[in-house]
Amino acid sequence: MKKRSETLGSDQSSSEIIEHVLEELNLKNIERRVKKYDQIESEYKTNIENEKKAFIKDVSQVQQKIKEFEIQKANQIKQLNEEKLSIEARKQQLEIEIRNQLLQYAEKLRIVVKTPMNQPTNTEV
């Protein structure tokens, strides 16, 4: 306190000195508050940046999973289409075989109907 009174001058009253000391204390208090505010703001910004990075990473992982899912589904669709074509080809093949067998049976039936009952047919063994 003595130093302050020396710096302020010996002609100042104690109330002026007290006022000056209070102003300095107030300034120090303000400086501490500003420093604390800056610290909180810095932590907040750091947390925001960390959350942003984590969010971007999560979004990237989700996008990757979506791409993998799309590729998987495209492969499944391709496989199903190939199976469908194979089944359709087999169906057509069976239709042709059935039609040929029916024609053979129809021809045999026609021969049986035209042949008298007591004559052997070339289909009998």
Curated annotation (Swiss-Prot):
One of its GO terms (biological process) is meiotic DNA double-strand break formation involved in reciprocal meiotic recombination. GO terms for molecular function: chromatin DNA binding. Keywords: Chromosome, Chromosome partition, Coiled coil, Cytoplasm, Meiosis, Nucleus. Disruption phenotype: Abnormal linear element formation. Strongly decreases DNA double-strand break formation during the meiotic cell cycle. Abnormal sporulation. The gene is rec27. Its main location: cytoplasm. This is Linear element protein rec27. It comes from Schizosaccharomyces pombe (strain 972 / ATCC 24843). During meiotic DNA recombination, binds to and activates DNA double-strand break (DSB) hotspot sites. Residues 45-104 form a coiled coil. Transmembrane segments: none annotated. Component of linear elements (LinEs), which are similar to synaptonemal complexes, at least composed of rec27, rec25, rec10 and mug20. Changing residue 36 to E: Decreases meiotic gene conversion at ade6, crossing-over between ade6 and arg1, and double-strand break (DSB) formation at a DSB hotspot. It is found in: Cytoplasm; Nucleus; Chromosome. GO terms for cellular component: chromatin; cytosol; linear element; nucleus. The keyword ATP-binding does not apply.
